[in-house]
Regions:
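Post-His helix in hydrolase/transferase enzymes
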Residues: 247-259
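Conserved hydrolase catalytic core segment
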Residues: 88-125
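Helix-rich cap/lid subdomain of alpha/beta-hydrolase
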Residues: 123-172, 179, 183-188
Length: 263
């Protein structure tokens, strides 16, 4: 059974989540232009053995947007609030921008175990860079299809055939509704310190997931840089997959997560 719940973050913002399963707690944090649904296929596979909390980050679904200006620090606080609800032994699991949020939260509020799937840290240069202005312009002009094509091709570096497949899928209307929220997250990523040395302070077992077909920048290069400062981290490749294995290969992702949790 899936139930809905919510917590109040440090700044008073309501953060919603879906809860399912029973057993040790897991908290899932989704990436940009997405919601808790990105993790639900994985969560349903793990629910027979774990209590899964799939949160909605601020500004989408049942979570509030918070006050301006937007700060990544508020995202860390949101994650910490859900972790507090899940309990002190909850493992934290983040994908993409959600992995950046999970890393930041874990630095400030220690967690027993951490899983990160391709955090787009700017180790090899800006994530959006010169393409952020065209993206903003497309959003301001209401051309959400163009904005998403810019974002998927220039920010996540997806090949044309992958973008076409997404555009004709049921996911495209949902991406359109979230396209504007990507701006503030891209701005936040491009202002991050490109050095990942700060993450060496993490004092917990870490699993890093990397898609074998993911682009070099900003995903594989950032994962390599992060692994270099976390020599004890376990790095697992999701064979035959890129950045969206949570949806496209949930069985592989769930299996790798559970293997890590059981060691």
């Amino acid at each position: 059974m899936i139930t809905e719940g919510a917590v109040t973050s440090a700044d008073g913002t309501r953060i919603g989540y879906r809860r399912l399963g029973s057993g040790p707690a897991l908290v899932f944090v989704h990436g940009s232009v997405s919601t808790h649904t990105d993790w639900m296929r994985v969560a349903k596979l793990l629910a027979p053995r774990y209590t899964c909390y799939a949160m909605d980050r601020r500004g989408r679904a049942r979570s509030g947007n918070g006050r301006s200006p937007y700060l990544l620090e508020r995202e860390y606080e949101d994650v910490a609030a859900v972790m507090a609800e899940a309990g002190p032994v909850a493992a934290l699991i983040g994908h993409s921008y959600g992995a950046i949020c999970a890393l930041g939260a874990a630095l400030r509020h220690p967690v027993p175990r951490l899983v990160v799937y391709e955090p787009p840290l700017p180790t090899g240069g800006p994530i959006a860079g010169e393409f952020l202005d065209p993206y903003r312009r497309a959003i301001s002009e209401g051309d959400l299809d163009l904005a998403l094509e810019i974002g998927l091709s220039r920010f996540t570096r997806l090949p044309a055939e992958a973008i076409l497949a997404i555009r004709v899928s049921k996911a495209w209307p949902r991406l359109r509704t979230l396209a504007a929220s990507w701006i503030r997250e891209l701005e936040a990523m491009d202002t991050l310190d490109p050095s990942v040395d700060r993450y060496a302070a993490l004092d917990c077992p870490v699993l890093m997931l990397v898609g074998s077909r993911s682009p070099e920048h900003p995903l594989r290069d950032a994962s390599r840089a992060l692994a270099a400062v976390l020599p004890g981290a376990r790095v697992e490749t999701i064979e035959g997959q890129g950045h969206m294995a949570t949806r496209n290969a949930p069985e592989q992702v769930a299996r790798l997560i559970e293997s890590f949790l059981n060691t």
